[in-house]
Amino acid sequence: MKKIVLLALCTLLIGPCLSCAQQKGGESQGGNDTSAEEREEAKTDSLSILVAGDLMQHSPQINAARSGNGYDYKECFRLVKPEISAADLAIANFEVTLGGPPYKGYPCFSAPDEYLRDIIDAGFDILTTGNNHCLDSHQKGLERTIMMMDSLKVPHLGTYKDAAERERNYPLLVEKNGFRIALLNFTYATNGLRVKEPNIVNYIDTVQIAGDIEKAKGMSPDLIIALPHWGIEYALKPAKPDKDLADWLFSRGVDHIIGGHPHVLQPMERRNATAENGGNVLVYSLGNYLSNQYKDNTVGGGMVRLDFVKEGGKVKLTKCGYMLTYCSRPQNSGKRNYRIVPVEMDDELNQQDKNIRNKFVNTATKLFEKYNVDFGRY
C-alpha cells in the first residue's frame, strides 16, 4: 500500500505546522524573489489512479486459500501486483465481509482476515464497502470489517459504525502527489437486509448524495470521483436508471464515475475528451476481478487507469484506458489457487483456460468496439 494522506485525520495537526511554517518563512531568503504562490503555479504534478472490479470470495476460493492454520491469497494477485503497485492510488470494491469464522461464501459472504491482508499486500490503497453484500454478516460483520480495515490502516468508504464516523470520514478525502481527491461510494441495496442503528450504509439516495457532493466541494478537491454500486446483474449494457444517475452525478459536479455490481463488463466512455480538463470518465461496470463465478461473461473483468497532471493549479486528464483480466480457477488450471491473469499472458494458462479466456475477451472486445466512447486499452 502506497503512502497517502487522509486529510480528515490530519486536520488537527495542520494548524500548528502551518503556524511554524509561516514563522520560518517570514524572513526573506537571499536571492529568492519568487513567492510561494508563484512557485506553486509553476509546478507540475502527476497522478495515476487505478480502479479494479469486484473482489468476491466464494466457498471454493476460501478452501483453495487454506494454508496450514490460516489462509494465503498472495498467489491470486501475483501476476497483477506490478500493475496495481505501479499506480499512485489503487482502488477496488471489497464485496465481502470480515465477520469472523465460520467463513462462508454465497449467498452471505464472510471471508478470512487474510483476504484483506493480501489485498493490501497486492498494492491496493483504498477499498469501497458500500455494496449489496456489506450486511451479509449483519451488524457484527459490518462493524468488524471496518475494525479490521482501520487496524490495517487501509482507507475505506461506504459503510460506517455510526453517524459521527460518517461525518468525520465521508466523503473520503485523500491527498497524493499534490492532488486532493474526494471519493464517494453508494449502493442500490443490501439484498433485503436492513441496516441496524447506529450503523450506516450509503444507499443511492439523490437527496443525500447531493448533500455529500456539496460537502465534497467544500473540501476544495482537485477531483471528485464517484464509485457507485449499481446496475443489473449480468447485463452487458447499462439500464436507463444508471444512465440517468450518471448524467445527474456529472451535472452536480462529479468529475469521474467508475461503477460495479453487474459482475460483467459494461461500456466505458470519456466524455468531452477535447475539453480543457481532458474530459470525464464514465465506466458503468468493471466486472469480476476475483471470484468463482463461471458464466461466460463473469470469468473476468478489468482495471481502468486514469492519468492526470496538475499545472498552474489546473487538473487535466491526460490518458485513460482499460486492461482486461481473466480469473483462472483451479477447476480449469489444475493449479492450487485462483489467479487474476492479464489476458495477454498466454504462458500462464493451459489450453482449457485459454479457450474460456478467449471467449470472454472476444465478447468484451465486441462490446467495447460498439459502445465505448474515446476509451480504449491502456
Where are these regions (language model features)?
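Positively charged n-region of N-terminal signal peptides that target proteins for export
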Residues: 1-4
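Repetitive helical segments and hydrophobic/amphipathic motifs
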Residues: 11-12
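C-terminal motif of bacterial Sec signal peptides marking the signal peptidase cleavage site
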Residues: 16-19
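Acidic, metal/ion-coordinating pockets
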Residues: 21-378
